[in-house]
Amino acid sequence: MAHKKGASSTRNGRDSNAQYLGVKRFGGQVVSAGEIIVRQRGTHFHPGAGVGRGGDDTLFALQAGAVEFGTRRGRRVVNIVAAAAAE
């Protein structure tokens, strides 16, 4: 049996905190103003109509309606459409 730990074991033993990133409200889901739609690092998704962007690139709803994912000029965008129009 080893009587010393070894060099690597004393250097390990730490982990980063979970970031909880990703899409929080999917296409077709109805949201109210202020709800977070996507948590991201960088602009993987860009804000469209009725969507704002926070300082950490989080996308959130500026108005109530249904979430709609699409593309514009080759970029993925998130829009909010009127809930009645989405049904």
From Swiss-Prot:
Q: Which residues form a coiled coil?
A: none
| One Gene Ontology term of the molecular function aspect | structural constituent of ribosome
**What is one term from the GO cellular component aspect held by the record?**
cytosolic large ribosomal subunit
The answer to keyword Ribosomal protein applying to this record is yes
* Pfam families to which the protein is assigned, alphabetical: Ribosomal_L27
PROSITE patterns according to UniProt:
RIBOSOMAL_L27 (PS00831)
Q: Where does the source fall among the domains of life?
A: Bacteria
What the entry lists under InterPro entries is as follows: Ribosomal_bL27 (IPR001684), Ribosomal_bL27_CS (IPR018261)
What Gene Ontology biological process does one annotation of this record name?
translation
Q: Where are the transmembrane segments?
A: none
- HAMAP family reported for this sequence: Ribosomal_bL27
Q: What is this protein called?
A: Large ribosomal subunit protein bL27
What taxonomic classification does the UniProt entry list for its organism? Bacteria, Bacillati, Actinomycetota, Actinomycetes, Micrococcales
The record's gene field reads rpmA
